[in-house]
Amino acid sequence: MTKNPKISLIGSGNIGGTLAHLISLKKLGDIVLFDVAEGVPQGKALDIMQAATIAGADIKIKGTNNYKDIEGSDAVIITAGLPRKPGMSRDDLISVNTKIMQDVAQNIKKYARNAFVIVITNPLDIMVYVMLKESGLPHNKVIGMAGVLDSSRFNLFLAEEFKVSVRNVNSIVLGGHGDAMVPLVRYSTISGVPIPDLIKMGLSSNKNIEKIIDRTRNGGGEIVALLKTGSAYYAPAASAIAMLESYLKDKRQILTCAAYLQGEYDVHDLYIGVPIIIGKEGVIKVIELQLTEEEKILFDKSVVGVKKLIDAIQ
């Protein structure tokens, strides 16, 4: 019998619990659900494992408060940290979540040095940078969940605008996972037809697309304002699963993620959202798109915003 991959989830809140459920339904591997809150990961693990029996998933799920249980993990997904509340930006979380991420990184360094690490905790681009520097893991094995989620929101709004299936929509959102993200209309298509061409055909307007871009940038904030007591978790979890699956199954999918750049896009020593190929080695390649002058200005503005936050924690 082939041994199941070991997947550790650091943080057992809404995203962590949803991740565990999705992993069990997809039968991607055995799960360790970690949290500092006693009883929470154990209770959720038991509940999800009972649900997994209905799905016919023969996997093990262990809830724990002990980091030693993540030892030998093939992949680790990190959601630990304070979530956003109404009126807060992702950046407002930086101080407390940096300390949490440093602690998580030290334990991954101790117990799971060979793992592929996906960071979800906000502010994303800064937290994944902290993870890399504190853990000492290779940069191709540490990425952040950003563009997959942002693109999924952009895809939904475009599908609604053009009244087509979301399966027909492909989009790319570059930059930091925040208000300065850069949805690339020129690289976004409906069944291969670029959005600017569809606008010329009279199927939409520049004004409507601009509204969609603004809504995409505020996609997380819109959900926070509606929930009032937390932030999005279904779509972030589904986005991380797409990244995890590409790694575990060596799918070599092109996904937009927060990746460590070393000169690509003229960016050095920084995590920023760009298209990458994910396979069994982790990040196989950064896809460097040719940007127009206007797109480059927006992208550079997003980079500057991330740099300022990095400087603030150093």
UniProtKB/Swiss-Prot annotation:
Name of this chain's protein: Malate dehydrogenase
Active-site residues per Swiss-Prot or TrEMBL entry: H177 (proton acceptor)
Record's keyword annotation contains DNA damage: no
Top-level taxonomic group: Bacteria
A biological-process GO annotation: lactate metabolic process
Catalyzed chemical reaction(s): (S)-malate + NAD(+) = oxaloacetate + NADH + H(+)
Entry binding sites for NAD(+): G11, S12, G13, N14, I15, G16, D35, N97, I120, T121, N122
The encoding gene: mdh
Residue numbers binding substrate: R84, R90, N122, R153
PANTHER family in UniProt: L-2-HYDROXYCARBOXYLATE DEHYDROGENASE (NAD(P)(+)), L-LACTATE DEHYDROGENASE
Annotated EC: 1.1.1.37
Gene3D superfamilies: Lactate dehydrogenase/glycoside hydrolase, family 4, C-terminal, NAD(P)-binding Rossmann-like Domain
Single GO molecular function: L-lactate dehydrogenase activity
Function: Catalyzes the reversible oxidation of malate to oxaloacetate.
UniProtKB keywords: NAD, Oxidoreductase, Tricarboxylic acid cycle
Keyword Oxidoreductase: yes
